[in-house]
């Protein structure tokens, strides 16, 4: 399922209150100021929707499924706050660009341009991107953050930011879980085989970072939330850097 905020499908992307089910953080802990200075919350028509990462003063990276097919005018982002409902700086969008090869769950990234510039400083910073062509190493630790649901099918989403650390899962293992064709080289997987820790509805588009706090991916999709033997699936920044660099 996708991981924006809503409940409809079981295998799709991860956003908030929409026609597809999207993940929140399951099995996580509260984030502290400064943990993710580049994270933004994305609301749609005033309600929780997705997450994203601030790349510079005018640009946010999120999942394509968070914005594809929806009116640009309905979106607002909030930066510089652990709360998705107050504090920080807000901006509407001036433009949306979805990856030109976005299809199904593949190439699931979009670039959002902001109507209001957001300077760095205080609790706000810009994401450091994984190198072009890089691929997260299986077994290494990664941390994902968001305001999504804390359980699969959960009807409420947290106001304050949560985070959870999970290991990178090899592409071979992830393909065994989902099927060879479902997991492309533009994706990577992370999760605990026993379940209990994952992104969930409402976390879509939000950041997953490596141990150096480098942005390696965006929350994309999965089979439910935190189920045993089903990893969370992420759009790969390293594999999709050319798109990001062209439009950021």
From Swiss-Prot:
The active site is at residues 65, 108, 204. Residues 1-17 form the signal peptide. SMART domains: Tryp_SPc. GO terms for cellular component: extracellular region. InterPro entries: Peptidase_S1, Peptidase_S1_PA, Peptidase_S1_PA_chymotrypsin, Peptidase_S1A, Trypsin_dom, TRYPSIN_HIS, TRYPSIN_SER. It catalyses: Preferential cleavage: Arg-|-Xaa, Lys-|-Xaa. It is found in: Secreted. Its EC number is 3.4.21.4. GO terms for biological process: proteolysis. Pfam families: Trypsin. Residues 25-248 form the Peptidase S1 domain. PANTHER family: FI18310P1-RELATED, POLYSERASE-RELATED. This is Trypsin.
């Amino acid at each position: 399922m996708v991981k924006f905020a809503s409940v409809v499908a079981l295998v799709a992307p991860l956003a908030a209150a929409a026609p597809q089910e999207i993940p929140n953080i399951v099995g996580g802990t509260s984030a502290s100021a400064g943990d993710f200075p580049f994270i933004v919350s994305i609301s749609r028509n005033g309600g929780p929707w997705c997450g994203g990462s601030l790349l510079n003063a005018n640009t946010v990276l999120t999942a394509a499924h968070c914005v594809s097919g929806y009116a640009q005018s309905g979106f607002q982002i909030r930066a510089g706050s652990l709360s998705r409902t107050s504090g920080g700086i807000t901006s509407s969008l001036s433009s949306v660009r979805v990856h030109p090869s976005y299809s199904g769950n593949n190439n699931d990234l979009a670039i959002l341009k902001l109507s209001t510039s957001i300077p760095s400083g205080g609790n706000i910073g810009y994401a450091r991107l994984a190198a072009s062509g890089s691929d997260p190493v299986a077994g290494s630790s990664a941390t994902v953050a968001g305001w999504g649901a804390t359980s699969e099918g959960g009807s409420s989403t947290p106001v304050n930011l949560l985070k959870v650390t999970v290991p990178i899962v090899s592409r071979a293992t992830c393909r065994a879980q989902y099927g060879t064709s479902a997991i492309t080289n533009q994706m990577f997987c992370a999760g605990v085989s026993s379940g209990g820790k994952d992104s969930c509805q409402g976390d879509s588009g939000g950041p997953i970072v490596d141990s150096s706090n480098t942005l390696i991916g965006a929350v994309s999709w999965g089979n439910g939330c935190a189920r045993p033997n089903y990893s969370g699936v992420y759009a790969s920044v390293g594999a999709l850097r050319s798109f990001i660099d062209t439009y950021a």
